[in-house]
Amino acid sequence: MATNGHFASIGVDNDKTAYEHGVQVIDENKEFNPNISKYLSLENVTHAGFNYHLISVFGSQSTGKSTLLNHLFGTHFSVMSDSERRQTTKGIWMSKNKREGEATVDPTLRMADNILVMDVEGTDGRERGEDQDFERKSALFALATSEVLIVNIWEHQVGLYQGANMGLLKTVFEVNLQLFLKDKNTTHRSLLFFVIRDFVGTTPLKNLQKTLMEDMARLWESISKPPGLESSSVHDYFDFQFYGLPHKSYQPEQFVAETKKLSLRFREGQRDPSMDARRGEFSEGGVFLPEYHRRIPADGFSRYAEGIWDQIVNNKDLDLPTQQELLAQFRCDEILREVMIAFDEAIVPFEEKQSQSARLGEPEVLGGLGAAMRSSRAKAVKNFETEASRYHKGVYQRKRAELESKVDTRLKALLQGQLNAAHKSGINEFSEAVSSSVKSGQKQGAGYDFAEIVNEEVKKAIAKFEDVARSTVVEGTTWSDYKQELALYEKELADVSGRLRREEMRRLANRVERWVQSRLGESVGLEFNALGSGRAGGGAPETGEKPLEKAFWDRVWNVFVETVLDAERRFTDRASSFDASLEEVDVGLWRLRRKSWGVLRAKIDEEMTEGNLLLKLRENFEDKFRYDDAGVPRIWRPTDDIEGIYTRARESTLTLIPLLSRFRLAETSAPPPLDRWIGHTPSSATPADEEDLPPIGGVDEEEGKSLDEEMMILSEAKRQELTVRFKKAADGVYVEAKRSAIGGMTQVPLYFYGLLLALGWNEIIAVLRNPAYFFLLFICAVGAYVTYQLNLWGPIIKMTEAASSQALVEGKKRLREFLESSDTGRQAIAMSAGSGRSGEQYELSDLSKKGKARTSADEDMDDL
């Protein structure tokens, strides 16, 4: 004989051979086996969900319970030897139905899938004696977990109290009320299946059923019931079925046949509403009705059973609904963790990449993020729903909400990061695209519509942002609405567009200002150049008429106004393509007028520098002094009124100094209306629009200068200095003219030619008679003429002077060397040195261009 205690005890590895005879759920010492889940996994029950059934068998010790289960379900529970009577099953054992899938005559009559059978230790054994604690606890455990309770009873024990296990059944009824007392909303039902052993048929089965049901009714009436259940019936909580089996030893063939027939009753069935157990009508169909199932998923059974037994063995009030909730809490947490592991594998790489991009300050739009988010979320929710939806609905829904919250929190952060990356990269790409299009238009030289470029790029940027957003969002979630982010993106695009437009208008203004500067430089320069011409003809306009000098500033102002008006037209026409507002155009024109005035004033200051002004005054004076009214150069003669012409020309030129010293219009004898022309500061101008503008007197009140002070070109001291210097220059011109006139009066006396002819007659004849002399004279004359025509006499004279000076220096040097080579010379040199005079030595390389010794000033000039 072998006992169940020898097989698969607690702690054995999950090798399938170790569980050949089943697994011990609870040992004789009331210890729960933690390897139940391993056994269920090996038997492929863990993933069955609700598609499993649990049966427990009750009965007195040594009544053949294990034998019955082995024949019904093909299990290998240990059985008692026929040669002795003793306890075989210790504790509670469990095994899976081994006859699952066996062929039957009727294919519709087949055993249910995944039937788990629990063999409970027999009652009324001498090993435990009067200790009924384990008996009660095991009954409570079996009732809390099993759908069907098989009561193994012999026919001759029917009608007895102890022999028919009436005490055990009373315990079952009592613990049943205790078990489901706290869950009054649901009536949990179980099936009590009486298997009457050694049934010979002398007493009809119906009579045995009637006797047992009368005993059940008396037992139910005898137990104390909680308030509200006093009138309850045993049929409110239990269903009953009965089956008789022949004697195993005396009728072995009939026993085997009947057990096989009985095994087919362990299939799924439906309640027949036409049958009433109170009238003795009992079903003979499938025993597994839906209402019997405890609704504990197979993967959570081990945990649930352990929790139930812990409550039972510690004598705590067993609250099955609470246990189911605790199991649901535990299993849902486990499932949630498993689901999150798979979720992390899909999402963490994107989170790390996004985090790294954020740390580097280079936001990146992650490809494939949306598909990964949708797929991982759907898988997580689906897997959780598949595994956890079988548990307590309240716990499942709460944990599902927790899962969705965790998943959505992380996915929302990814979506936000993706939208931020699309936002920043889109803004950068938009700015670069607009700048590139503008540069391309400028290079092509053709006109380009800035507003059209901006509008086109804005459409592209928004479309790209929406594509990224749509590809990333997870449908059906409240956090996938990106309208706010899109609105912020559109707002920043508008801000950037405005900034780019202002920058482009600023560049346009700069180009227009350079154009104004160029035009004013030419036009105003011509007006100042005209001051240098004091005559008509070549120095006047093409008409030959000399412009009036007193209207000089009128012409400058008119040229300035016309140039700026032309620039304003250019600016306005170009700004219209920028879609600029009227306020922006007004600010641009206002800045253009102020900048243009600065350009004009800078040009005037450049022309009015002391050197330039003296040059123009001298040119003006010389034109009036050296040329007549027709523009013909004067040839001075002693009879000319040089003093009168000089005085008139000088006084006429001197009138220019007070004219040029102040910007004043001849028509009004007042400064030009600069303040009205520039206008007031536009209300839309910002401090940034004004910060680079220099103040203008008479326009800016805070400048503290009046318009007259702004129009002051030359101060009084400058005017006096210019007057003095000009007069000195004019006096030089006058002296030169006077010398020219007097020089024309100096002539050689006629008698000198007669004297020259008389004294040099012989030499003249000698030269004329001698061809060589004559030819030499001719060559010299031609050379002198050519030299004169080429203006080379001056350089020749300078070279001659330089050569003679160098020869003198070289002669002194050689003389010194000669003296130093003799004793007498050295003594003379020593005496000369003692007298305090040191001889000057000059090298050829130290001579200046004029043949003189080079000074430090000459060296500085050569460096420049």
Curated annotation (Swiss-Prot):
<dbReference type="GO" id="GO:0005783">
    <property type="term" value="C:endoplasmic reticulum"/>
</dbReference>
<feature type="topological domain" description="Cytoplasmic">
    <location>
        <begin position="793"/>
        <end position="864"/>
    </location>
</feature>
<keyword id="KW-0342">GTP-binding</keyword>
<feature type="coiled-coil region">
    <location>
        <begin position="480"/>
        <end position="506"/>
    </location>
</feature>
<protein>
    <recommendedName>
        <fullName>Protein sey1</fullName>
        <ecNumber>3.6.5.-</ecNumber>
    </recommendedName>
</protein>
<comment type="function">
    <text>Cooperates with the reticulon proteins and tubule-shaping DP1 family proteins to generate and maintain the structure of the tubular endoplasmic reticulum network. Has GTPase activity, which is required for its function in ER organization.</text>
</comment>
<feature type="compositionally biased region" description="Acidic residues">
    <location>
        <begin position="688"/>
        <end position="701"/>
    </location>
</feature>
<dbReference type="InterPro" id="IPR027417">
    <property type="entry name" value="P-loop_NTPase"/>
</dbReference>
<dbReference type="InterPro" id="IPR008803">
    <property type="entry name" value="RHD3/Sey1"/>
</dbReference>
<feature type="transmembrane region" description="Helical">
    <location>
        <begin position="772"/>
        <end position="792"/>
    </location>
</feature>
<keyword id="KW-0547">Nucleotide-binding</keyword>
<keyword id="KW-1133">Transmembrane helix</keyword>
<dbReference type="Pfam" id="PF20428">
    <property type="entry name" value="Sey1_3HB"/>
</dbReference>
<dbReference type="GO" id="GO:0005525">
    <property type="term" value="F:GTP binding"/>
</dbReference>
<keyword id="KW-0378">Hydrolase</keyword>
<keyword id="KW-0472">Membrane</keyword>
<feature type="binding site">
    <location>
        <begin position="59"/>
        <end position="66"/>
    </location>
    <ligand>
        <name>GTP</name>
    </ligand>
</feature>
<keyword id="KW-0175">Coiled coil</keyword>
<dbReference type="InterPro" id="IPR030386">
    <property type="entry name" value="G_GB1_RHD3_dom"/>
</dbReference>
<dbReference type="GO" id="GO:0016320">
    <property type="term" value="P:endoplasmic reticulum membrane fusion"/>
</dbReference>
<feature type="topological domain" description="Lumenal">
    <location>
        <begin position="769"/>
        <end position="771"/>
    </location>
</feature>
<dbReference type="GO" id="GO:0003924">
    <property type="term" value="F:GTPase activity"/>
</dbReference>
<feature type="transmembrane region" description="Helical">
    <location>
        <begin position="748"/>
        <end position="768"/>
    </location>
</feature>
<dbReference type="GO" id="GO:0005789">
    <property type="term" value="C:endoplasmic reticulum membrane"/>
</dbReference>
<feature type="region of interest" description="Disordered">
    <location>
        <begin position="830"/>
        <end position="864"/>
    </location>
</feature>
<keyword id="KW-0256">Endoplasmic reticulum</keyword>
<dbReference type="Pfam" id="PF05879">
    <property type="entry name" value="RHD3_GTPase"/>
</dbReference>
<feature type="region of interest" description="Disordered">
    <location>
        <begin position="675"/>
        <end position="701"/>
    </location>
</feature>
<keyword id="KW-0812">Transmembrane</keyword>
<dbReference type="InterPro" id="IPR046758">
    <property type="entry name" value="Sey1/RHD3-like_3HB"/>
</dbReference>
<comment type="similarity">
    <text>Belongs to the TRAFAC class dynamin-like GTPase superfamily. GB1/RHD3 GTPase family. RHD3 subfamily.</text>
</comment>
<feature type="topological domain" description="Cytoplasmic">
    <location>
        <begin position="1"/>
        <end position="747"/>
    </location>
</feature>
<feature type="domain" description="GB1/RHD3-type G">
    <location>
        <begin position="49"/>
        <end position="305"/>
    </location>
</feature>
